[in-house]
Amino acid sequence: MTTRKDMQSKRHAEIVGGGFAGLAAAGALAQKGWSVRLHERSPELRPTGAGIYIYENGLRVLEKLGAYDEAVKGAPFAHTREMRDEQNRVLSVHRWDPSKRVFSVVRQRVINAMADEARKNGVEIVLGSEAVAATPDGELIMADGRRLKADLVVAGDGINSKIRDSLNLIAKRRPLPDGAVRIMIDRTPQERAASDGGTTIENWSGSRRILYTPVSDTEVYIALTMLHSDEVGRRVPIERASWKQSFPHLSDLIDRFVDNGQYGRFEYIRLKSWSAGRVAILGDAAHALPPNIGQGAGCSMMNALSLAWYLDREKDMATALRTWETNERPMTEHTQRISVFLGLPTTWPTPMRRAFLTLAGKSKWMVAQRTKTARHIPTGT
């Protein structure tokens, strides 16, 4: 519990959002001696989505936060990514550099690990607590009318951030042509016997994709990706018959799909600035991107950790926030560009898309661009 005495003797942060960005910022600031209170509007910490890839860059952040061991416990060490067409022919194979770690994990496990470490460092996590706006002088305005004063307000409240919008920070917000339904299913004994869980398979058929990713010894993460205009494809509960028509060789897998998925359309967001006065914006609220290289959470955690690092080195808030954005934003925007670019084939004719995917898997330049973020050493690690 953060006491009034703590707030008076330490620099104090009010953080909005209990996802990757908010929890990473909370843990990192607490490690630097801040008093921290985190607000999550939901009654529990439950992330959107089901599974997630965490690459070397994100794993370094988790290590720094003390959450690494618990976050990746039981998760497969990912080593191979295949792309296949509607006839199950392999279009490309990418084998990750074994010296750079990649884990496919259950999102909830990572969130729980980060929250546990944040609490150990003194962070107060308040559930069912909704913030609706902030002021540049560091005041957080709550849905119940309270106004909470802080040295720093951090907005990690997602793509529809009320804090960001209250400060008029959006430069560009663009819905993308595709989206995804994400679910978790049980991993069968046959699947467990046939594979170590380290191979991810992305199956393409027209503009539809089925991503198959083991995330534990007993669970598989499935992402169904389709054009937003594909009303049948994005329907929840999932229209199994329609997906079987697209992927007949995956009929047995599709029969195992559960009905509790959620559809989300991908978006791109770019801000005028990552901060306004004493308010910093993190995660999807600042730089939403499609998941085509699996770095949404990675960028969020890197930027959260580096925010605490710059604030610790430079006591002047304005200078610290300006330096943070100047140094960290280029890598994030590279990640956004390459993620959007790799989503373009979704709208292309099948022959053109097949040729691109085959070429992209062989191009050293393309591989270097898509792995640049994963190979980046996060500031503060």
Predicted regions and their residues:
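Flavin-binding catalytic cores
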Residues: 232-263, 326
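Conserved Rossmann-like nucleotide-cofactor binding loop
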Residues: 21, 44, 160
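C-terminal helical "tail/cap" subdomain of flavin- and related membrane-associated enzymes
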Residues: 2-11, 73, 80, 99, ...
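Glycine-rich FAD pyrophosphate-binding loop
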Residues: 30-50
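Conserved N-terminal helical subregion
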Residues: 3-13, 30, 55-167, 171-188, ...
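Histidine-centered metal-chelating micro-motifs
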Residues: 161, 180-182, 208-211, 286-287
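Conserved mid-domain beta->alpha element of the FAD-binding
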Residues: 15-31, 39, 154-155, 260-341, ...
